[in-house]
Amino acid sequence: MFPMVTEFMNYGQQTVRAARYIGQGFMITLSHANRLPVTIQYPYEKLITSERFRGRIHFEFDKCIACEVCVRVCPIDLPVVDWKLETDIRKKRLLNYSIDFGICIFCGNCVEYCPTNCLSMTEEYELSTYDRHELNYNQIALGRLPMSIMDDYTIRTIFNLPEIKT
C-alpha cells in the first residue's frame, strides 16, 4: 500500500508542475497581446538595420596586401585572391579579388581578422537576383558603397515607434 501512496503523490506533484508550466506559457502569450504590430510594407518601408548587421561585404582594393588571411579564416574558403609576386620589391601585388555571395554565409570572419581593415560589412541586404552567377562579386562590385536608405526619398524609413506630439 505504501508504494501506491508515493505514486499518487508523484502524480500530484507532476500535475501541479505541468499546470505551472502551462500557466507560464500562457502568461508569456498574454504579455505579447499588448504589443503593437511590427509588420511593415516592405518595398516602400524599410527598417533601419543595427550597427552590427552583417550585410554585403565592402572591399577596398588599395588597402589589401594579398595576405590571404580572409581565405584561411573563412569556414568555406570562399574569397578568391589572385596575386602576383613582384620579385624586384619582394611583395605580393593583388590582381583580382572576388566573393560569391550565393555561397557566403555572412559569418564576418574575413572582416574581423583582416589585418589592414580592407574588408567591412555594409547594411545592404537586398542581394536577390534571377541568376545566381550575378552574386559573384569582383573587386569592382565589392568596392561600390551601397546606396543609403536615408538618402532615398521614395522609401519611408521606420525607426522604432512613431512619436506622438502633443
From Swiss-Prot:
Positions with a binding annotation for [4Fe-4S] cluster 2: C74, C104, C107, C110
Any one of the GO CC terms: chloroplast thylakoid membrane
Pfam families reported for this sequence: Fer4
Keyword Translocase: yes
Reactions catalysed according to its record: a plastoquinone + NADH + (n+1) H(+)(in) = a plastoquinol + NAD(+) + n H(+)(out); a plastoquinone + NADPH + (n+1) H(+)(in) = a plastoquinol + NADP(+) + n H(+)(out)
Biological process per Gene Ontology, one example term: photosynthesis, light reaction
EC number annotated for this UniProt entry: 7.1.1.-
Enzyme class: translocase
Domain spans labelled 4Fe-4S ferredoxin-type: 55-84, 95-124
Disulfide bonds: none
Stored PANTHER family: NAD(P)H-QUINONE OXIDOREDUCTASE SUBUNIT I, CHLOROPLASTIC
Protein name: NAD(P)H-quinone oxidoreductase subunit I, chloroplastic
